[in-house]
Amino acid sequence: MVDRETRRLSFGSVAADYDRYRPSPPPQALDWLIPAGAAAVLDLAAGTGAVTREIMARTPRPARVVAVEPDARMRAVLAARCPGAEVLEGQGEAIPLPDASVDAVLISAAWHWLDPERAVPEITRVLRVGGTLGVIWTSRDDRVPWVAEFNALARESREADRARQGFSGRRRREVTFPPGTPMSPPAERRVTFSLPMTSEQLAGLLGTYSGVITLDPERRADFSRRVRAFLDRQPWDQVDLPMICRCLRSTRLPG
């Protein structure tokens, strides 16, 4: 049986593909999440640096961009792809930064891997008063019929994996704080956008999710065949993939 910690760190085994196929959030999302004039921004659970690169591309660029990631294999790609960022080993439950040292903490596609009881106090500790926590989920827009069918393939694999490993319930998609936490109630914004994707890129994207990575070789090969069969039925080899970026923003309060 693959435990949750193994799943959480499974992405490093496909770090190059993760970097190649996982989408970045649109710039409009970061514009809303990062406070004006932010001098120091932390990308927490940074993966291979998709959000880190977006932060560094901003004008004006924050004077300090820090990326914290627990997996050494992901950090190696991150460091190579994000020269100029400060890349550190660490995790949300133990952030290797001093108190009140950053103006924004961004967490993309990773909130569900954190333990909020331990991570929230760490996030509030490193945030300056007036700074923001931004949590990002970027997902495919299944209001489009072919995307709904494509998502069903991914969901089937994930649910089979959860049943096999003894997991239950939906991934955590809300941000809540314990009573007394000096953070404002989260505000929400959604940004729609699209990405040009080839069939090969779509197949590669599904291969970067933990539910697929941790399948045994036989099940993974069967999953790949079904994905390829679905893509071969489509009347295109390249398509604009509709996406939704859901953002939650909370401000660090005094206290």
Q: Where in this protein do the model-derived segments appear?
A:
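Class I SAM-dependent methyltransferase SAM/SAH-binding core
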Residues: 40, 48-94
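Conserved Class I S-adenosyl-L-methionine
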Residues: 172-255
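Conserved class I S-adenosyl-L-methionine
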Residues: 1-37
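Conserved catalytic/acceptor-binding region of the Class I
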Residues: 118-195
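Conserved beta-strand/loop positions that form the S-adenosyl-L-methionine
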Residues: 44
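A short SAM/SAH-binding and catalytic strip from SAM-dependent methyltransferases
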Residues: 103-117
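A short acidic, Gly/Pro-enriched loop at the edge of an enzyme's catalytic core
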Residues: 93-104
